[in-house]
Amino acid sequence: MDNEYDLETLAVRAGSVRSQFNEHSEAMFLTSSFVFGSAAEAAARFKGEQPGPIYARFTNPTVQMMEARLAALEGAERCVAFASGMAAILATVMGLMKAGEHVVASRSIFGSTVQLFSNILGRFGIETTYVSPTDPAEWRAAVKPNTKLFFVESPSNPLTEVSDLRALAAIAHEAGAWLAVDNCFCSPALQRPLELGADIVIHSATKYLDGQGRVLGGAVLGSQALMEGVYTFLRTAGPTLSAFNAWVILKGMETLSLRMDAHSRNALALAQWLETQPAVARVLYPGLPSHPQHALAMTQQKTGGGIVAFELKGGKDAAWKLIDATKMLSITANLGDTKSTITHPATTTHGRLAPEQRARSVWMSATDSSPTEIGRAHV
């Protein structure tokens, strides 16, 4: 579908392919394999001489529709879908790098991503150096002759730190490396990293792309050349997105723009309200003028997003007390749901990290009733 259409139209129409039955809603192909018309056709498919599905570990028509839609939303040449966001990150490294090479990564990233880089990839000879997400000079200083990848979340999980993606892209390319951006906190409705110079965009489709906390999924996007290596890892190792999950994500993307507008509006209102509360030590939300990278965020993002981080003056005990006192907020580590969620990252998603790496904030996604609910919990 021509990308001259607006994002709202692409979210509904891009990637749709009808079967011979001309269904209006995209079809879900629940099958492990596909039948060939002849031995010659089977051979041609496996050699890559003829297009068409072969085996569901390789791909599936429903998955392909989901990939095409997300590629249109991100402005990417190609998307490769995975069973989870973490599988997508692993595939990016394993598909494009080899032992003896080096990653420069933001030190403010998801806890499982730190575990992956430090404890798993390190065993296979891929070294990682962690640097400040907000200081491009640290990224430049960390570059080695064998550096192949820069990895960053912007905004970061959970402190919503915003990185200068244009600056990081320039430093990475000067070093002969790629810049990969985890765009989970924004989605393409709010930020398109490829337009800012990134080479690779990564998603946990579990979050805003699904939008209702129903299924797991992941995706890696970029040029055809880069994605060929990522796809080779998928085809060989098999962290494949199921047709059912792809269909759910495909339908979830139809309302992405509407949901992100509402998430952003509600999060801003919550952040503004939290700034007035005496028990709150600080509020971290990119849409607030008080956020350290507010000006930068507004040059990269459409809005501040749907996630608000805040610290209470009473520390962990106060945070737990608040969380336990809420009634209409779900205590869960997921984000991007239509239901408001709340968690304490230092003792959940980032609990296995060293103490100096843990965020002290409470972390929330918001609905329009969130200030009332937090108020009832006696912040």
Model-derived features with residue positions:
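Conserved C-terminal alpha-helix-loop-beta "cap" of PLP-dependent enzymes
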Residues: 282-369
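Conserved PLP-enzyme active-site core in the AAT-like
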Residues: 2, 11-17, 78-279, 284
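Conserved small/polar residues in nucleotide/adenosyl-binding loops
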Residues: 377-379
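Glycine-rich beta-alpha junction loops
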Residues: 16, 30-36, 185, 255, ...
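Short, well-ordered beta-strand elements within core beta-sheets of diverse protein domains
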Residues: 249-258, 306-313, 369-373
